[in-house]
Regions:
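Intrinsically disordered, low-complexity regulatory segments
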Residues: 1-186
């Protein structure tokens, strides 16, 4: 079986229809030798400072620069701080099972830097080793999807796009976290 991952459910529905994955399951469609699943945008994000043992806004902690960034499921505001979004955690479990049980993953997240990051962060978070290829389309017409599926590209072709997105994500984190803490301490 091959697993196709789209960035959102509406795109997954269109692709599933084209590949004959008409059986609706929890978190994916199945049929025709495919499982077609989806993210809800960024399912995985960089951990906040407390994920690195840094609590509160303390001048001596600045600048906050992790040795390496940690990926965690997307968080939602809780009574005290943040907690993992239960719907996201559930979808990640479904995707993990599909990815690890597949012979190949077809990446159908949006054709661009963020779409690539959404998939790669999830792939790395899961610790997946299943080979993947890229469906690079900018239209959801039946013809565009079919043509894209006939012309899948090596996932490695998009490594630099992923690295650019990762650099942007990490630099946004560094500027945002350190800027917020520095300005709050100075106020």
């Amino acid at each position: 079986m091959k697993t196709i991952i789209a960035e959102k459910p509406s795109v997954a529905r269109e692709i599933a229809r084209i590949v004959g994955a008409t059986k609706r399951e929890e978190g994916y469609f199945e049929g025709g030798g495919y499982a077609v699943t989806w993210a809800f945008g960024h399912l995985v994000q960089l951990a906040m400072p407390d994920g690195y043992g840094i609590r509160g806004f303390v001048r001596d902690n600045l600048p906050v620069i992790p040795d390496s960034f940690t990926l965690i499921p997307r968080q939602v505001k809780a009574e005290k701080g943040y907690k993992p979004d239960s719907g996201v955690v559930s979808q990640i479990k479904i995707i993990s099972r599909l990815f690890n049980g597949s012979e190949q993953i077809i990446v159908a997240t949006d054709a661009g830097r963020e779409g690539e990051l959404i998939f790669r962060y999830l792939y790395h978070y899961i610790g997946c080793a299943t080979p993947f290829v890229r469906l690079w389309i900018s239209s959801l017409t039946d013809k565009a999807i079919r043509d894209g599926l006939r012309n899948l590209e090596a996932g490695s072709k998009y490594d630099n796009l992923y690295l650019a997105a990762k650099a942007r994500s990490e630099s946004d984190w560094l500027v945002g976290i350190n800027g917020t803490q520095a300005l709050s301490i100075a106020a």
